């Protein structure tokens, strides 16, 4: 079942933790690619110096952050790596959750091809398929075309995992500082990165 619009409403930190263990799905050329979310980061601009929307900064790139929760915010870093975020909080409150890592589930062969241009890969390469925000976007085929897309769409959405299949029974949620935000002054220390401790696909232990 797809996560309903109400799933994305409420406090961004709570939504971030709720996203752990759910499945991110992208349909590419009719083929389902997906992964279980195992690592996220919350961004609570305009008061969060690590957020693109800090200070209420409103640009063409960040405009989607000011819209309704439950939409995709995709951007490029270093001019080459895409990052996928889920918009949270009410309209006009630019907050979101960066999906940092997934455990691949569906479309494994397509994911391998997207990452390595081959399907015969090593165990180390397999663990590297979706263990980072840029990696998972490449694996699932998420690009700037998906920016602003509703997560109620048929092609891009979050699938709720039934409780009896949820990996939360195997891993504990850990919290810590977010990654690669050295510019963010005191926000560097906010423990707004949430992940499954010990999960092999987490980007940074």
Swiss-Prot record:
Alphabetical list of InterPro entries matching this protein: Formyl_transferase-like_C_sf, MPG, MPG_sf
The keyword ATP-binding appears for this protein: no
EC number: 3.2.2.-
Biological-process GO terms, alphabetical: base-excision repair
Keyword Cell membrane: no
Pfam family, one: Pur_DNA_glyco
Annotated keywords: DNA damage, DNA repair, Hydrolase
Molecular function via GO: alkylbase DNA N-glycosylase activity; DNA binding
Family: Belongs to the DNA glycosylase MPG family.
Protein name: Putative 3-methyladenine DNA glycosylase
Organism per entry: Bacillus cereus (strain G9842)
């Amino acid at each position: 079942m797809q996560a309903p619009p109400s799933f994305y409403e409420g406090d961004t930190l709570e939504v971030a933790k709720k996203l752990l263990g759910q499945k991110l799905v992208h349909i590419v050329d009719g083929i389902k690619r997906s992964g279980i979310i195992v690592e996220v980061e919350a961004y609570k601009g305009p008061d969060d110096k690590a957020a693109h929307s800090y200070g209420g900064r409103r640009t063409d790139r960040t405009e989607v952050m000011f819209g309704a929760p439950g939409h995709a915010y995709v951007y490029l870093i270093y001019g080459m790596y895409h990052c996928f975020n889920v918009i949270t909080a009410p309209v006009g409150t630019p907050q979101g959750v960066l999906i940092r890592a997934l455990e691949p589930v569906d479309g494994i062969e397509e994911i391998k091809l997207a990452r390595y241009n081959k399907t015969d890969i090593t165990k180390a390469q397999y663990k590297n398929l979706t263990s980072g925000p840029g990696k998972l976007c490449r694996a699932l085929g998420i690009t700037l075309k998906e920016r602003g897309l509703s997560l109620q769409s048929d092609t891009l959405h979050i699938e709720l995992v039934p409780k009896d299949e949820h990996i939360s029974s195997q891993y504990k949620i850990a919290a810590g500082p977010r990654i690669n935000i050295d510019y963010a002054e005191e926000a560097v220390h906010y423990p707004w990165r949430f992940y499954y401790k010990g999960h092999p696909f987490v980007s940074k232990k």
